[in-house]
């Protein structure tokens, strides 16, 4: 058993090393050839985040033809923020909100309304808490053209301020890039190798309309990677690249926000309950058990296994600019991750669904319910 764990831990270290060395980042724009881009921002109670987001978009230059914001029935001052910025720049438009239709999640419905109103060659969907770097839009357009893509997602840099952000948020990249073979996705088009981050999705408008876009994944809570899989399944070329140079995001700002945010996505991310429990068992056995067993045995293979896991964390921390001290908290972070998964599963199994921004969703969304 211990030897098997050691082999698996070393193999996963190899995958992480391949990602660090072979997974490409979005390149800075060099041609100066502008595109025609609609920046599409779904916003629900984003009064706090939206000003910085819009400021960053307005610095992008002439490639941005229009900036559309969908105020999804916010109860704060989101609409007033959009109106203030609209008076500064006529490219900004507020897309009128419609009642959420049965069978849709709120974000998917908002994105579909934004896409229906967009008029540019390219659609760039970004979250309201995302911050585009200078010339980010030009860089994305250039990647779309140079790589002949119809779908591009950027994995953003993570802004982390509080203790719990720095301790827990790096687990997102650890979970993904310790098992996802990023370099393989460049050369193989199978949908299983699709990956996306919902904070930054770019597609050309033509393929979006032909495929159906968010309407095809209307009930999905984990819609970003589902969209990436859909594009590949329909014969389009899509990639996810390291986007730290072009976009950053502060996803959550407290332990409570982290818990509720990942509780929303955790169990729904899996196609079946079997795959969910396989993931949970794998993470408990490979990434947590070696540290627990070291408390009762001094087997040298366990020390190497634990060292391989921490080395994986260190590699990814260096690539994604995470605080190195958080690596030492790996057993705690891994335990919280597993508790999050069980919590997400339990809510869905008991029919409570997952609450997010005043709505409650079930694994396959029906009509949302107000909290």
Report each predicted region and the residues it spans.
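Long helical/loop segments within the catalytic core of UDP-sugar-dependent glycosyltransferases
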Residues: 11, 93-116, 143-210, 259, ...
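Short, well-formed alpha-helical segments that are part of the catalytic scaffolds
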Residues: 22-27, 46-59
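Cell-envelope/extracellular polymer assembly enzymes that use nucleotide-activated donors
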Residues: 35-38, 66
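Acidic donor-binding/catalytic loop of UDP-sugar-dependent glycosyltransferases
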Residues: 77, 128-143
């Amino acid at each position: 058993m211990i030897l098997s764990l050691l082999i698996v831990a070393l193999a996963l270290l190899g995958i992480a090393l391949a990602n660090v060395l072979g997974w490409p980042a979005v390149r800075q724009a060099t041609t100066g050839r502008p595109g025609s881009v609609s920046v599409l921002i779904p916003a629900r109670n984003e009064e706090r985040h939206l000003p910085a987001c819009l400021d960053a978009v307005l610095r992008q230059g002439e490639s941005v033809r229009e900036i559309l914001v969908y105020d999804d029935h916010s109860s704060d001052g989101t609409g007033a923020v959009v109106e203030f910025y609209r008076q500064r720049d006529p490219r900004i438009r507020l897309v009128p909100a419609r009642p959420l239709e049965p069978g849709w999640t709120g974000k998917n419905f908002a994105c579909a309304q934004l896409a229906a109103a967009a008029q540019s060659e390219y659609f760039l969907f970004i979250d309201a808490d995302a911050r585009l770097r200078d010339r980010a839009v030009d860089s994305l357009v250039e990647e779309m053209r140079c790589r002949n893509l119809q779908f591009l997602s950027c994995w953003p840099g993570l802004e982390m301020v509080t203790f719990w952000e720095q301790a827990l948020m790096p687990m997102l990249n650890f979970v993904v890039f310790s098992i996802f073979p990023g370099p393989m996705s460049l050369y193989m088009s199978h949908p299983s190798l699709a990956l996306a981050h919902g904070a930054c999705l770019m597609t050309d408008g033509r393929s979006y309309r032909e495929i159906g876009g968010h309407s095809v994944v209307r009930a999905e809570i984990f819609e970003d990677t589902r969209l990436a899989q859909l594009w590949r399944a329909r014969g389009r070329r899509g990639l996810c690249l390291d986007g730290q140079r072009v976009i950053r995001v502060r996803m959550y700002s407290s332990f409570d926000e982290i818990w509720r945010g990942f509780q929303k996505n955790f169990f729904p991310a899996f196609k079946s309950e079997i795959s969910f429990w396989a993931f949970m068992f794998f993470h408990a056995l490979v990434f947590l058990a070696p540290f627990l067993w070291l408390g009762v045995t001094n087997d040298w293979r366990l020390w190497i296994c634990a060292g391989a896991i921490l080395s994986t964390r260190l590699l990814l921390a260096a690539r994604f600019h995470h605080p190195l001290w958080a690596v030492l908290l790996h057993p705690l972070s891994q335990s919280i991750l597993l508790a999050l998964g069980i919590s997400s599963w339990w809510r869905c199994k008991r029919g409570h669904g997952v609450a997010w921004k005043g709505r409650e969703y079930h694994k396959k969304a029906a009509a949302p319910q107000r909290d």
